Swiss-Prot record:
One of its GO terms (molecular function) is S-methyl-5-thioribose-1-phosphate isomerase activity. The gene is MRI1. The keyword Hydrolase does not apply. NCBIfam families: eIF-2B_rel, PRK05720.1, salvage_mtnA. Catalyzes the interconversion of methylthioribose-1-phosphate (MTR-1-P) into methylthioribulose-1-phosphate (MTRu-1-P). Keywords: Amino-acid biosynthesis, Cytoplasm, Isomerase, Methionine biosynthesis, Nucleus. Gene3D superfamilies: translation initiation factor eif-2b, domain 1, Translation initiation factor eif-2b, domain 2. This is Methylthioribose-1-phosphate isomerase. Belongs to the eIF-2B alpha/beta/delta subunits family. MtnA subfamily. It catalyses: 5-(methylsulfanyl)-alpha-D-ribose 1-phosphate = 5-(methylsulfanyl)-D-ribulose 1-phosphate. The record marks 169 as: Transition state stabilizer. It is found in: Cytoplasm; Nucleus. Pathway: Amino-acid biosynthesis; L-methionine biosynthesis via salvage pathway; L-methionine from S-methyl-5-thio-alpha-D-ribose 1-phosphate: step 1/6. It comes from Fusarium vanettenii (strain ATCC MYA-4622 / CBS 123669 / FGSC 9596 / NRRL 45880 / 77-13-4).
Length: 388
């Protein structure tokens, strides 16, 4: 198990790793209230759908634990907490884990009821937030196991016939409570001696692949190679047979009812390339990332980011001798600052390009009708939404 932690928590204190400083600096920010949690998420100092939900929940839990609630009645307490949760929801609207966590927390404090004491409501909220944190690690370990077994069955991965994979963005310990989703499958493949090599994209424009995934892979000694986003087609065409490249494994910020998947920008093009080159395309996501209320990807709200993320970049200074000065950072322009920029943070991969959605409850494949059916793994939610 990796010792990398995006989030450090004990009751009353939350520390969040500032991932904008990686890989050159390891620094934790203390998050003590909803405003700091919102800012940490919005500025992408923390990212990854599970980690975002965890930071939002625990950030407010710390604030409440430390006595910020000014309500004088149970009803007012519930109202203040729900107002704070609605505020946090806007920090990253595409990530359905955040919405699901907020709904779960609201349901819990309402369950305690308006007749309970203020202290009982706050205590129930804190305990529920901690459950979200604790459950995520178990979920990720299960995703890793199911993903590795699916690849063993579908592409013949074995210690004698190891496979190589490509991943996009960052979906490891830095995006979750630990182990990871897509990168968790890669970790499990490595542990079971099924992995030959892992390729990771740099993931422009925020470079989560080069800054974070490459960092995690090197940290754990997993054989790996970094490529630019635009090299994927050439990689499949020239190295697929030599390296036995069998799958692209990505995470998800939202998987909707028909299987359409919102993930980091650049995911869709990888899915198209994988299909063309006969490479399996796998989405790894907890069931909390599955949004049954939204029928297709057309209903997903896509966040757009500021233009400077494309036209400027920050990095550590390289000394004349070629070594990295980790204490010295510089921000430079990479384009004419007057150019117009379109910068969506996510894209939507249609279900037709996805071979499997791997969750903590198993790997789901499309049925004979070419559609994903999540009713078997989410029967209660499915029945509630569809009436079936």
């Amino acid at each position: 198990m990796s010792t990398l932690q995006a989030v450090k928590y004990i009751r009353g204190k939350l520390e969040v790793l500032d991932q904008l400083r990686l890989p050159h600096e390891f620094h934790y920010d203390e998050v003590s209230n909803r405003t700091e949690a919102f800012d940490s998420i919005y500025t992408m100092r923390v990212r990854g759908a599970p980690a975002i939900a965890i930071v939002a929940a625990l950030g407010l839990a710390v604030e409440l634990h430390n006595g910020s609630c000014t309500a004088s009645s149970a009803e007012e307490t519930i109202g203040q907490i729900e107002e704070a949760l609605d505020y946090l929801k806007e920090s990253r609207p595409t990530a359905v884990d955040l919405t699901n966590a907020i709904n779960q927390l609201k349901a819990r404090i309402r369950e305690v009821g308006s007749t309970a004491t203020k202290e009982a409501i706050i205590s129930a909220f804190i305990e529920e937030a901690e459950k979200i944190f604790e459950k995520d690690l178990k979920t990720n370990l299960s995703i890793g196991d199911f993903g590795a077994e699916w690849l063993r069955a579908q592409v013949g991965a074995s210690p004698e016939q190891q496979i190589s994979v490509l991943t996009h963005c960052n979906t490891g310990s830095l995006a979750t409570s630990g182990h990871g989703t897509a990168l968790g499958i890669i970790r499990t493949l490595q542990a079971k001696k099924l992995l030959h090599h892992a390729f990771c994209t740099e993931t422009r424009p925020y470079n989560q692949g080069s800054r974070l995934t490459a960092f995690e892979l090197v940290f754990e000694g997993i054989p790996s190679t970094l490529i630019t986003d635009s090299m994927a087609a050439s990689l499949f065409r020239t190295r697929k047979q030599e390296k036995n490249i069998a799958a692209v494994i990505v995470g998800a910020d939202r998987v909707v009812r028909n299987g359409d998947t919102a993930n980091k920008i650049g995911t869709y093009q990888l899915a198209v390339l994988a299909k063309h080159h006969g490479v399996k395309f796998i989405v790894a996501a907890p069931t909390t990332s599955i949004d049954l209320e939204t029928e297709t990807g057309d209903g997903i709200k896509i966040e757009e980011r500021k233009k400077e993320e494309l036209t400027q970049v920050t990095g550590a200074v390289i000394k004349p001798d070629g070594t990295v000065d980790e204490s010295s950072k510089v921000r430079v322009a990479t384009a004419d600052q007057r150019i117009n920029v379109w910068n969506p943070a996510f894209d939507v991969t249609p279900a037709e390009f996805i071979d499997a959605v791997v969750t903590e409850k198993g790997a789901i494949e499309k049925g004979p009708d070419g559609k994903f059916d999540f009713s078997q793994i989410l029967p209660e939610r499915w029945a509630k939404i569809t009436g079936a």
